[in-house]
């Protein structure tokens, strides 16, 4: 502000006449005159007028001199050191700077704060944030004090008016007032004066500040309520926090708040007791009899008085004392009350702040009002709620001034209470909701703006739309390299606009404006600039739904014509994409950091392995498989063809392979012969191994190799370290080419070929094995090149093969009718037995169904034998390109048994195949299954998506934060079995993990793996060879880290096959790995058969949910509660069966278990049973197992059960992902005895808090607290998160915010969600370097410094 502004006359200011008169009398004629007085002198001179002058003093920073502000010498010295010359400098300083400078002198800082309060000035807290900086350490939430609400406010809203319908300008003192909230147009006041870009000046006439219009998104107002109002969150939410705090029943408290009853504050001469609740009638009678000698209040006023009278410290002491004396039921209610009272006592909240005298008004930018055509307005519903409050508040004010009757005022107060309730939460009000007139539904309150998928958290904070993005349909790009994608020029020209403009400015030496003009013309220069810009600039492609991290990957863009994005065919499995109209979104990383991350971490060619199990995710499919299958077929010349035109086709075949057994010098000679049609791709030929650049033994090099040209072409893409692949076997791949294919010199080739068996062609499974083997030996970049070669070969030779499907390819099975006749006869026999009473209906049904199943299998086997090797449909199935044996049986054999809508098998089968055609009745039977399939898929997708969301939420804060937590415990693993079959091998379970103790050979005692050594594949094989059945490994379940986990407990990162790095977000990866295959799981709960009492066995997705949510299982198994011996099993017909177990230590003590009738008993007499062992079939109740057998057994059980469900669908997920989820289910502990800690018995707290409390007691040599572990379902675990932001954005938003506000909770921002919400870098990946957990030195530290640090650690 220029100094000449200080010579403005006070008469031009917007001041009342009495104030102007006082200023004149004090000798203050201009603003400069204020500088001649101190603050205290001004206060004494102006008296009550001082408050009216204060805003002017603040706006012009008066008095200027720091000495005139009544600050102590110490404060002035600190401010001078900071380089502040006057009051204006002080007002422009950020709070962060002041806080730091006054750290050592809190009393001086208090003085400065008092000055700010007087001037209603609150310095800016946030400093200018740079990219990725973290200048905040935590996020705190608490109740707002009335003074704070007034301090946030820029003025009181007194009128319910919004916008003038004629001028479209905001009304003065209304909900959109420019004086309170700031100007509607940048630097323009309400009377349309303009001021150019100088802030902090006010219009003399209308009082609006000249500033940017964006302040309307941050400036708040307030409404001064004529009567106190209770905040509905603390009254109407269940359980009512206010009711618990005041120890009043919720219903009674509601009656007080809504002016139905009165509460006695001071009984005076009456017979009432303090805090007694009386009715309106009782109050009127007492008032009539005793007059004003007693005090009884109603409404929020009464609640406020009760809260103010609460002595928290005293109440805590009384309650703690009564804890030990009362019954269990009373103790629970005392603990609930204690929790709330202690929350208030330990935080800087006051209970009376739950009753409001003033409410804040949201900035108008967040509740806009837009004029529509025809003079109507579209408005946010919050505005209607505010208008209702203002209407009722103003009416109440008027009635109070007019001294209206008590009844009328009471009714108006109740209506005001309801209006404020509706503003904060319009769903909870016990009274009638405030409805939208047009749509007849409750208006959207502030709580609704936060809740649910459309709420602020999930819609705007966790998922934002981003610029520089586009979307288009995808088509195949067979000519692309692995790391490329085709981007349409039309898209790229817009997406890369800023880079093109920069390029134009650099090359042509022009300014921004001219560059824009050239860009608009879209001439040759612009397109050339685009070609330059796109080079080496990766883009991200994403396909919804993004089920796992491979759903968004980086590619190098290649500009193409047309309008569709082109995608490399090999990356489709990772995106689960196909080319039937799928769309993909494209994003451009802008900053250099983002581009580097995209290239190094997200490029497709670096993401070849699936994070869930470490298998290659980019395996060739369909045409690529078919082409390679066709290429590697080997045919004998002397084969006879039996089908149609057999003579002609046999002759053609023999002519094609007429030169079988020919010797060639090298591959080029063989190719020339093929081009001249002397040999075929499948003809068996001989070649010298020396001419092939692959691995052979010395002995093999002296002989001739028998192979085909097709196989020579295929082997040409393999590196020299590989053996020549001549047959699809593990031996050929891992060891060498079998010697059987080598012809010793001097041997008759014709005789040699006759004896030699024909190897199978290379199918999809074998191609995957080659890729996995290649990946182990080579770098990622080499693998991606090799994959491109496989793709090119596949497409080329599937085109050359010209494989088609025709009607003639489907041959019906010759023996079908005889087989059907046999079954019909047998079924008639079964029917006869049933009629004669030898079979029950259920048994008859089972036998009939089994007969049809057997016959279908027989037809299937026969069909496969009749199918010829060169049948195109057979080739598709055999190669793994498309279709399965079952599909062909339905095409050419018989469709078989179908299910009805309930999922039960229909007895009558579909006898026809699709080749023969179905009857109407058969077609009808088939429709049930098809319809059920579609509905199941739709339900499954939603269910699976919700499961993934819960899993991500429960694990999102699990990040690898250190190398080693030095845990001395381990987790013992063994091969996983189900029904006697091995479902996960021991080798798979231990590979890539660390040993928790030394593992020695059981016979020789030689060390195989040392403690804390990584078990690599060769070591795992040694362990298996040594016949070790149980291996102790480091596990996430035994990790000692306070937050996150350590690298040693996690092991190898399956996506890279290297040790996991610090900062890896392993929690999210685990959740995605379990959730992503969720759609492949079944939705069924299977019936065990016709037995009425047999329980349903839950499988598939419902079973996973049952385990992770810790629900009581259907068909619960009975478990043993002790270690002992089974004495007897009684199966008495009239009663339920009974198992008797004797204790191991005390054989005389017997435990009896009564069973349900018809259950399968899994144990027999004299068996030894252990705690937690299943006695009957079914699923175990996890809470029961935890009580009986302890944590480790439950963790092991969950791990095995989850694996069983996924393995049943042939999905393999690494144990470590499931372990992370289980780790999160066991993060809380139930306090049994509090010892000398501040913990409350019966409460559930995190293990970290429990450990800290006990460590403190150990230091002070006091009694420790005792607790027992509890198991939480993933939803409950998410809601109990230490982070209030993470929990609130998940579910039950208001409930979590209510509790967090009462406790004055602090969120230390350890997880990912919290940081995304407040717009910071996540503490994972490259962002972990910025967090408070990791302080890396800016400059390289000297060796002496590093040694010093290590010693300190």
Curated annotation (Swiss-Prot):
Entry-linked CDD domains: RNAP_beta'_C (cd02655), RNAP_beta'_N (cd01609)
EC number: 2.7.7.6
InterPro entries per the UniProt record, alphabetical: DNA-dir_RpoC_beta_prime, DNA-dir_RpoC_beta_prime_bact, RNA_pol_asu, RNA_pol_N, RNA_pol_Rpb1_1, RNA_pol_Rpb1_3, RNA_pol_Rpb1_3_sf, RNA_pol_Rpb1_4
Catalytic activity from the UniProt record: RNA(n) + a ribonucleoside 5'-triphosphate = RNA(n+1) + diphosphate
Binding residue positions for Zn(2+): 189, 191, 203, 206
Protein keywords: DNA-directed RNA polymerase, Magnesium, Metal-binding, Nucleotidyltransferase, Transcription, Transferase, Zinc
GO cellular component: DNA-directed RNA polymerase complex
Keyword ATP-binding (UniProt): no
Cofactor requirement: Mg(2+); Zn(2+)
A UniProt-annotated Pfam family: RNA_pol_Rpb1_2
Residues holding Mg(2+): 578, 580, 582
Cofactor binding notes: Binds 1 Mg(2+) ion per subunit. Binds 1 Zn(2+) ion per subunit; 2 are expected compared to other organisms.
Gene Ontology terms for molecular function: DNA binding; DNA-directed RNA polymerase activity; magnesium ion binding; zinc ion binding
Keyword S-adenosyl-L-methionine: no
GO biological process, one term: DNA-templated transcription
Record region (Unknown): 1-117
Record region (DNA-directed RNA polymerase subunit beta'): 118-1353
Physiological role: DNA-dependent RNA polymerase catalyzes the transcription of DNA into RNA using the four ribonucleoside triphosphates as substrates.
PANTHER family (alphabetical): DNA-DIRECTED RNA POLYMERASE, DNA-DIRECTED RNA POLYMERASE SUBUNIT BETA
Subunit-structure text: The RNAP catalytic core consists of 2 alpha, 1 beta, 1 beta' and 1 omega subunit. When a sigma factor is associated with the core the holoenzyme is formed, which can initiate transcription.
Family: Belongs to the RNA polymerase beta' chain family.
Protein name: DNA-directed RNA polymerase subunit beta'
Source organism of the structure: Aster yellows witches'-broom phytoplasma (strain AYWB)
